[in-house]
């Protein structure tokens, strides 16, 4: 059985003052049976790791190379040195804003794994692809192209985030989420065997305290990658509790 993971992606939000929200979350009554992850901006990783308690800290991206002339980029080794244990790779905002393709995501995932980080690999279809009826083909191809052969249930997490649901308040129906997650699970098992069965599959896209419980009741949903609702402990805490109760 896959472990449960509640992951928060702060994106480009937060300065040092915002770490009070992390401390509030860490000092609260976190339920057993759920791993909790916060991915703050890179400028906060070291300070966040010092204050996170049992909460894991991750980066939001890494370079595929370990070092070199790559101004503004961070290697997976650097993230690990700063205190990160996870890193998000291939988020749709990176794919869209920086032109990252599946081959780039695969190379970064390999780099993360080599550095000892858990890679949270993101995939998802656009609204046009959803309306064209090609969702399963699109996410299946992204999954195949983005994951290297060395994937295990310990070093990789897959997050399905329909691009049209991120930050829009729009959420797929539960049947639509189930269809995609069941297909992804089948693809993972076909390629990776037992590891594919136990690898956590997260849903992301406008997850909030009010809809988390029903989303976590969907088959093959092992947690969530949460954006805006992870910025405040008062919002993220109930999502974590809903996952624990699922």
Curated annotation (Swiss-Prot):
Catalytic activity: D-glyceraldehyde 3-phosphate = dihydroxyacetone phosphate
PANTHER family tied to this protein: TRIOSEPHOSPHATE ISOMERASE
GO cellular component: cytosol
Quaternary structure and partners: Homodimer.
Function comment: Involved in the gluconeogenesis. Catalyzes stereospecifically the conversion of dihydroxyacetone phosphate (DHAP) to D-glyceraldehyde-3-phosphate (G3P).
Protein's UniProt keywords contain Iron: no
This protein's name: Triosephosphate isomerase
UniProt lineage: Bacteria, Pseudomonadati, Pseudomonadota, Alphaproteobacteria, Rhodobacterales
UniProt-listed CDD domains: TIM
InterPro entries documented for this protein: Aldolase_TIM, TIM_sf, TrioseP_Isoase_bac/euk, Triosephosphate_isomerase, Triosephosphate_isomerase_AS
Matches recorded under PROSITE patterns: TIM_1 (PS00171), TIM_2 (PS51440)
Alphabetical list of Pfam families matching this protein: TIM (PF00121)
Annotated EC: 5.3.1.1
Active site (catalytic residues): 91 (electrophile), 161 (proton acceptor)
Key word Signal present: no
Enzyme class, UniProt record, top EC level: isomerase
GO biological process per UniProt: gluconeogenesis; glyceraldehyde-3-phosphate biosynthetic process; glycerol catabolic process; glycolytic process
Binding annotation for substrate: 9-11, 167, 206, 227-228
Domain of life: Bacteria
Compartments, record wording: Cytoplasm
Keywords: Cytoplasm, Gluconeogenesis, Glycolysis, Isomerase
HAMAP family noted in UniProt: TIM_B (MF_00147_B)
Single annotated GO MF: triose-phosphate isomerase activity
Record family assignment: Belongs to the triosephosphate isomerase family.
Record gene name: tpiA
Record-linked Gene3D superfamilies: Aldolase class I
Pathway(s) where this gene product acts: Carbohydrate biosynthesis; gluconeogenesis; Carbohydrate degradation; glycolysis; D-glyceraldehyde 3-phosphate from glycerone phosphate: step 1/1
